[in-house]
């Protein structure tokens, strides 16, 4: 099992993580060392999506180096690169307030950074020459044992469409999930486990302070905007 279970998903649900996840992130023989793509986004394309600067280039290099382990060591980070990784939700500081799963509740400091599972899967796919976010989402949810994994692509698309500044109400996620015959609570839990959403605080523009709110992964929302 990849490192970081307690920090990324919290204690809840970690014990029940499907065995299919084990060993999924392996280096394949013949993998392109430059990440040239058969289709979709290349590593150079990711760098440009992140701003095309030195920090973006270093962030991508660190993700390529450490995605299999799932953690980027603090001694390989500088402040600017860590901020880039954090802003795009490509990696998050391991420490957090009160063991919270919320990205916004994490301490920000130069420390080890954890790579969400969905980002690990995407980097692996780009290494294989398949830089397509939809293919990554489908592969991830198949790996954890979900049937009709393509549903999660459509659910994520609708979540982004309904969100305001990448914040979506839990009630909206439940409504979207029901359209595909899925339990909203299960979808939320699995989306959190993937790293596609995180609990957040405040009611924002929704005006429903009692409703749980979730932040959508910025990088994957950008991939959706770019690739459709």
UniProtKB/Swiss-Prot annotation:
Residues 1-20 are annotated as: Disordered. Residues 1-18 have a biased composition (Basic and acidic residues). It comes from the Archaea. This is Uncharacterized protein AF_2141.
């Amino acid at each position: 099992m990849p490192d970081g279970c307690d920090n990324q998903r919290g204690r809840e649900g970690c014990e029940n993580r499907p065995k299919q996840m084990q060993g999924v992130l392996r280096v394949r023989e013949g993998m392109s060392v430059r990440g040239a793509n058969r289709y979709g986004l290349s590593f150079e394309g990711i760098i440009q999506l992140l701003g095309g600067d030195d920090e973006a280039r270093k962030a991508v290099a660190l993700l390529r180096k450490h995605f299999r382990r799932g953690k980027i060591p603090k001694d390989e980070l500088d402040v600017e690169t860590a901020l880039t990784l954090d802003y795009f939700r490509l990696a998050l500081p391991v420490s957090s307030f009160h063991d919270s799963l919320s990205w916004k509740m994490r301490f920000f400091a130069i420390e080890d950074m954890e790579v969400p599972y969905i980002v690990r899967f995407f980097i692996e796919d780009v290494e294989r020459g398949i830089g397509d976010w939809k293919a990554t989402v489908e592969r991830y949810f198949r790996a954890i044992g979900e049937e009709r994994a393509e549903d999660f692509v459509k659910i994520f698309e609708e979540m982004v469409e309904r969100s305001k500044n990448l914040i979506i109400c839990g009630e909206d996620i439940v409504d979207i999930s029901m359209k595909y015959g899925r339990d909203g609570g299960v979808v939320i839990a699995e989306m959190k486990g993937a790293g596609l959403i995180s609990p957040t605080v405040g009611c924002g523009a929704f005006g429903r302070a009692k409703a749980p709110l979730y932040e959508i992964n910025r990088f994957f929302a950008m991939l959706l905007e770019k690739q459709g």
